[in-house]
Structures are given as C-alpha cells and as structure tokens.
C-alpha cells in the first residue's frame, strides 16, 4: 500500500507533518483511559476513532472516510447516493452514513453495529462477502 509508519517518543516529537497517530494495544481495555483523555482535551480539534478494536486513531477534525468519499466524488459525475460502502470499524461510520447504501461486515466492531443498526450485515471479510455481493449485484460469474 505504500503506508509507512514510525514509532516516536512523543516527549521529543514536534508534531509537525504528522497526519495521523495510531495507538495500538494488545487488550482493548488498555486504550480506554487514553481515549477518554484525548476526547476530553482534544475532542474539539481531532477525530478520535477506532479503526479496529485494538487500534485507536487520532487525526485532524475534518478527516474521515466520509469526507474522503465526498471529496473523491466532487469532480465526477456521481453523487453520494450512487455509492455503496462496506465497513467493519468505527472509522467507517461517516462513510456508511453518507453513502447511498451502506453495509456492515459480520465481523465488524460491535460499536459500529451499534452506531449503524439500520444497515444490513452482509457476511465476513474472510469469506469475501464484499466480492460476492458485488459479483451478484453486477451479474459477474
């Protein structure tokens, strides 16, 4: 994917040029206190969301998959209502809410399912549920 990461000592890091910060834990409970602190002190300036049960992401307030989808469509002849979106993490809420049709994966973070109870669940990532859904939708064999 070309994604690069760097582990840094935040006490020595200036923060300039940082697009996103990931906090990863073995146990999801280890992130709760950090999440509470970040939301209390930076919730008005940052998007704080889980991309996986054990991965907390922090980025600019105006950054989300929903914003990215809307930006992508700006110069194309499609609207958000024309889009289908699939999600499995809390960082998918905005995108799923904006798309014309959103689907939640069976293996999705329970917090995503709670945030989007109206969306249909389509199956597991490991079972290629997205590919199977699209193949059926478009008549591909």
Language model feature labels by segment:
Residues 1-86:
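Conserved acidic, metal-coordinating active-site core of Asp-based
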Residues 57-141:
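Mg2+-dependent phosphoryl-transfer enzymes with acidic/Ser/Thr/Gly-rich catalytic loops
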